[in-house]
Swiss-Prot record:
Entry keyword annotation includes Membrane: no
Classification via InterPro entries: FBPase_C_dom, FBPase_class-1, FBPase_N, FBPtase, Fructose_bisphosphatase_AS
Note on how the cofactor is bound: Binds 2 magnesium ions per subunit.
Gene name in the database record: fbp
Lineage summary: Bacteria, Pseudomonadati, Pseudomonadota, Gammaproteobacteria, Cellvibrionales
Residues engaged in binding substrate: D106, G107, S108, S109, N198, K264
Name of this chain's protein: Fructose-1,6-bisphosphatase class 1
GO molecular function, one term: fructose 1,6-bisphosphate 1-phosphatase activity
GO BP, sorted A to Z: fructose 1,6-bisphosphate metabolic process; fructose 6-phosphate metabolic process; fructose metabolic process; gluconeogenesis; sucrose biosynthetic process
Main location: cytoplasm
Binding site for Mg(2+) 2: D103, D106, E270
GO cellular component: cytosol
Catalytic reactions of this protein: beta-D-fructose 1,6-bisphosphate + H2O = beta-D-fructose 6-phosphate + phosphate
Positions of Mg(2+) 1 binding: E84, D103, L105
């Protein structure tokens, strides 16, 4: 099996980018070990603190964030980092070529129940026209990402990543500590009969989106004339991994629970990297009225609606929303 770095070199990845990726993934190997140890390593439970999102931090949230942050800030090619757990941009080497944003532990509500969790990350070229610690470093549309990926901590530790070409899958060889190429190219089927959605929010959705979901639930007796199954992990990283490996549509639409915050998922370090992975695997990724990768960010922790997955099903969903 091919190791990670030779694969990156074969893909023509910029030599300055490779050490950034390696440094980031070194942190995920340590996180994977802590996750496997669970209660034995004292990482379960919550802290008394909240992050910038107003969410109670889990102990492993804090540990994962610190591991990734510390390693990246030692990497000379990293000019700045942004994290779900950090209020502001953290400056690195002012001469670094790249900026890195990440959700250190997606699905952290699953930690204490031994459910699916993961790390989502994205890498952008650094901007020379703004200071290293400026939010403007990260105010770039998603199509300017040079690398996007996630690590899923499950029965095996899996890395899914793209550097602009195919979306590839790697598996961590725990014996030697290396990520090995196990899926040369993930391909999302055009059609699907599975959807991932938190149905508990149904009463808060727009009328067009509710009609779309209702037609899914009607199955063979409705206008779709086929049966759909629902899957929901309460972790974007797990639900999107299913979509990338066997098809489906993942949806986290806007809702009216809180008019000041109609969307849930963060554009920079959740929606954009997952959109790039999905598109490079042949799927589509939209935010109700536009392609996710075309959105011009206006704030560091900006939230957007997300609809991604099998291309034909995303088109059907969008036809309801844009009618």
């Amino acid at each position: 099996m091919q190791r990670l770095v030779p694969t990156l070199r074969r893909d023509g990845v910029n030599p300055e980018l490779i050490p950034v990726i390696r440094t980031l993934l070194a942190a995920t190997k340590e996180i994977a070990f802590r996750v496997r140890q669970g209660a034995l390593s004292g990482v379960l439970g919550s802290t008394l603190d909240e992050n910038i999102q107003g969410e109670t931090q889990k102990q492993l949230d804090v540990i994962a964030n610190q591991l990734i942050k510390d390693l990246l800030l030692e990497e000379p090619q990293v000019r700045a980092i942004a994290s779900e757990e950090e209020d502001t941009v953290v400056a690195g080497n002012p001469k670094g070529a790249y900026t890195v944003a990440f959700d250190p532990l997606d699905g952290s509500s699953n930690i204490d129940i031994n459910g699916q969790i993961g790390t989502i990350f994205t890498i952008y070229p650094a901007r020379d026209d703004v200071p290293a610690d400026s939010e403007a470093q990260f105010q770039q549309p998603g199509h300017q990402q040079v690398c996007a990926g996630y690590v899923l901590y499950g029965p095996s530790t899996i890395l899914v990543m793209t550097t602009g070409g195919p979306t590839r899958g790697y598996t961590l060889d725990a014996t030697h500590g290396s990520y090995l190429l196990t899926q040369a190219q993930l391909s999302v089927p055009l059609n699907t009969q599975e959807f991932a959605l938190n149905m508990a929010n149904q009463r808060f959705w727009s009328a067009p989106f509710q009609r779309y979901v209702q037609d899914l639930l009607l199955g063979e007796t409705g206008p779709r004339a086929k049966r759909f199954n629902m899957r929901w992990n309460a972790a974007m990283v797990g639900d999107v991994h299913r979509v990338l490996t066997r098809g489906g549509i993942f949806m986290y639409p806007s809702d009216n629970r809180n008019p000041r915050q109609p969307a849930k998922l963060r554009l920079l370090y959740e929606a954009n990297p997952m959109a790039m992975l999905t598109e490079n695997a042949g799927g589509k990724a939209w935010s109700e009225n536009q392609r996710i990768l075309n959105i011009q960010p206006d704030s560091l922790h900006q939230r957007v609606a997300v609809i991604l997955g099998s291309a034909n099903e995303v088109d059907v969903c969008m036809s309801y929303l844009l009618e």
